[in-house]
Design a protein with these regions (language model features):
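Short, flexible helix/strand-to-coil boundary loops that buttress conserved ligand/catalytic motifs
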Residues: 139, 157, 195
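Acidic, glycine-rich loop-and-strand cores that form catalytic or ligand-binding grooves
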Residues: 135-146, 150-152
Length: 200
């Protein structure tokens, strides 16, 4: 799959996002409880594409002492504050978690909302950032930041399906193996959605 940034811009801006649409793929791929959809909390994440010669995606690894999603690999993001839209929330959270100034983010487009098994309806916002920023993880929330080649994470052959038990039920979810920490669950599902959109 090509990771040319102009091609990505063109594909995403041409894509017709359906607000509130439950994506084809979720972190409970085959068994998401659709009865929960009305009670989901709005949230947003920034999907930061770093504009290197070979573009990369920026991920955070959450601190092990966090109350939610401890130690997991994630995009920077969180719930919407009152009066915020998804883009503003994604930029605010990215600045809080990684010291990324919003002025340096070229917002390309939001993609389909992503419903998580933990009760959130997440809007992923794809943005392009320059490669020379002095980013820094928020000490209380983020253990580290790392990059993964965009071509790698968009490669469907790296999108593994696994099963495991959660809250007494067997769940099916995506995993994208990586040396700095496996990308799995909701974050991997959002990457799979992005790959699907770019190849439609």
């Amino acid at each position: 799959m090509s990771s040319d940034l102009d091609w990505i811009r063109a594909r995403l801006r041409r894509y017709e996002r359906i607000p509130g649409h439950l994506p084809q793929f979720g972190d409970d791929i085959d068994n998401f409880d659709t009865e929960l959809l009305g009670a989901l909390t709005p949230a947003a994440v920034l999907v930061p594409v770093i504009a290197r010669r070979e573009p990369t995606l920026l991920f955070t690894k959450r601190n092990a002492n966090m109350r939610r999603h401890a130690g997991q690999v994630a995009f920077p993001g969180g719930r919407l504050d009152p009066g915020e839209d998804a883009v503003r929330a994604a930029l605010r959270e990215a600045e809080e978690e990684t010291a990324l100034p919003p002025v340096h983010v070229e917002v390309v487009a939001p993609i389909d909302d992503y419903a998580t098994g933990t009760g959130f309806r997440v809007t992923p916002v794809v943005g392009i950032i320059p490669p020379d920023l002095a980013l820094m993880p928020h000490e209380a929330a983020v253990e580290s930041l790392f990059e993964v080649p965009l071509d790698y994470v968009l490669d469907a052959s790296k999108h593994e399906r696994r099963t495991g038990e959660w809250k007494g039920r067997e769940r099916t979810f995506y995993v994208i193996p990586w040396r700095d920490g496996d990308i799995w669950g909701a974050t991997a599902g959002m990457v799979v959605n992005l790959a699907r959109i770019l190849t439609q």
